[in-house]
Amino acid sequence: MAATAVTARQRILTALTGLHLLIVGATFGGMVVVGPLLPQVMFYKLGLEPLTAARYMGVIFQQLIGPLYLLAGAAVVVEALRLAFGERPHWAVAGVRYVAAGVVLAAVVIFGRYYVPAVQAYQTRGADALASPAFHALHEGSRRVFATGLLAAGVALILVPRR
């Protein structure tokens, strides 16, 4: 009976680890697409006027931030479920995984709730506003927050299968 319970628990942990890997991988992949790759396409490859490209990017960010919220939150929940079902990783691995998941969630929320609306507010003011030092400072802050989240997602992705 005890062996059956251990086997069932191990199967659940294996499934949770796979789900966790899928969630963190999707989060990382989504962030790579909209972070480093999308601006290169929108501003350089398509040859769009900067204000038009910025507006398109704003719409894309608005559409993708919801799924990123869900993925980042789900990563934290699945991490907790893994521990609840008896996984006992080394304390340092568990700590770094939790911190990384929290940083990703915080970065996505800050980016989506503060930076995306703030950047879009500048877009309504026209091309001159987008050339202002205040906009450049805001945009640089958004890039740093997003890059921090992307780095944390990469760390989490590496550590998901570790115990």
Residue ranges and their predicted role:
Residues 22-29, 99-112:
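Hydrophobic alpha-helical membrane-insertion segments
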